[in-house]
Amino acid sequence: GYVEGGSTSWSEVLKFTQEPHQDRFSPPSFKTFISKLPSRHPRVLVASDEWDTFISQSEDAPERAWYIARAEKTLKVPMKHIDDTDTSKMAGLDNEVKRNALLTRESRRIVDKEEVNAEVFVRAYLLTKDDRYYKEAMKRILEMIKWEESPNFVGDFNESALLSLCSMAYDAFYDKLDA
């Protein structure tokens, strides 16, 4: 309940009844499920058969210009590496918790920046079909995956950020990927 002015007020009791004749949940067999899946990859960001229309409809969108300009600018900037994490202040910290907090904060600066850069390349590729963006995104994502081996790759959400980025790249680059 909610306490207001020293007394507790309760909401009304809500309920539902399960009748014996209600439909039961019965998932389809695996064979039925598989037979209904589309034969092409069900893209999330842009369906492949609607891609050209998406590109032409986005021609005048300010977001398109922003993504392309940012991608062009980022192409000229070398990728930061996780080993570039600023650890210079670690020696002055007196306990493990403080050192871990500093390392987490400093490594997230690099992870966050490169995650955004790779996402910009993915979106710029979807807006243009320019292979330069595809190649740069893949190069950076493949490098970022290697960061898991670094002692500087610290943080609660680094792996989920990489997983999200890889999922986006898989969706966008599906037709270009090989085994």
Please provide the spans of the model-predicted regions.
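Residues that flank catalytic or metal-binding motifs in active/ligand-binding sites
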Residues: E12, R40, L162
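Low-complexity, Pro/Ser/Thr- and charge-rich linker/hinge segments at domain boundaries
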Residues: T17-R40, V44
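Aromatic-lined, polymer-binding surfaces characteristic
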Residues: Y67, R99-A179
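N-terminal carbohydrate-binding/catalytic regions of secreted carbohydrate-active enzymes
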Residues: W51-L127
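Mature N-terminal segment immediately following signal peptide/propeptide cleavage
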Residues: L37-Q57
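Extracellular fibronectin type III
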Residues: V3-R24
